[in-house]
Structure formats: C-alpha cells, structure tokens
A protein has these predicted regions:
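N-terminal secretory signal peptides
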Residues: 28-71
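Compact alpha-helical subdomains of small soluble proteins
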Residues: 56-137
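Bacterial N-terminal signal peptides that target proteins for export
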Residues: 3-14
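A generic "functional-site adjacency" signal
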Residues: 1-4, 39
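N-terminal signal peptide c-region/cleavage motif recognized by signal peptidases
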Residues: 20-25
C-alpha cells in the first residue's frame, strides 16, 4: 500500500491543534451592527409592557432589560457572543443557573419562550433597518 504524504500524522500537528483550539473558541467578536441590534432588542424588551419569567418569578420588562444587560456584559467579557443570534441562544433564552427557559408574557397573551419573542423582535429590527437603508438609496 502506498504511503500518502498528506495523511501522515505528525505529533507537531496535534500540539498545534491543542494550543490553537482554545484561542479559536474564545475568538467571538461582536460587530458594531450586532451590538446595535442587541441594544435595540433589549431596549424594545425594556420599554415593552411585557413581563419576563426567570427562575420561578415574573419580572418587569425593566428588570428583564437590566438582567439581560448584565448577562451580555459577562458574555462579552468572556468573548462568548459574536452575533445577536448567539446572544439570544447563549444568554437570553434560559437561566445559566437553573437551565430553565425564560418566558415572555405580553398584554395578557399566553407566555412564549423568550428566544421566540427575541428572534421575532430581531427580525423586525432588521426589516426596519433594511427599509431605512432602502429609503436612503
């Protein structure tokens, strides 16, 4: 059987992979646009008439805004968020303490998972941004 020079295992390759993987895992950088989207998202939540359920208790929209801002700051410090979607997935959809999902309830409507509410609002933010860009052009 012929030896394939491209498939040969080199111990130095393993060492390189071990050293570089942690750096790649922590390389999430938030773009200016993503940060603006998250800020708008949290502002929409904070100024809404919705309630936010976490760890067994309903909280006001203002308290939800403050809580999620603290989680965002922590995640940014740890380089764990690179987009609005990642923030929703990692920081705004469930408790990092209990693992229980966050819920949102607006205007006496049935509660829904916060991830659904936030993604829907993010879609609206993006539609509005695209419409503003189109009007400028």
């Amino acid at each position: 059987m012929a030896e394939n020079k491209y498939m040969t295992f080199k111990p130095s390759s393993l060492v390189f992979a071990i050293l570089i993987l942690p750096l790649l895992a922590q390389s999430a950088e938030l773009s200016v646009t993503s940060r603006q989207e998250i800020d708008l998202l949290l502002d929409r939540l904070g100024s809404s008439s919705c309630e936010f359920y976490r760890n067994g208790t309903w909280h006001s929209a203002a308290k939800a805004h403050n809580h999620l801002n603290r989680k965002l700051a922590y995640l940014l410090d740890k380089h764990q968020v690179g987009s609005a979607e990642e923030f929703i997935e990692i920081g705004a959809s469930k408790s990092s303490v209990s693992g229980k999902p966050y819920l949102v309830r607006c205007n006496k409507q049935p509660e829904i998972p916060s991830a659904f509410w936030l993604r829907r609002e993010l879609d609206l933010i993006r539609v509005n941004a695209a419409a503003q860009t189109a009007r400028k052009n």
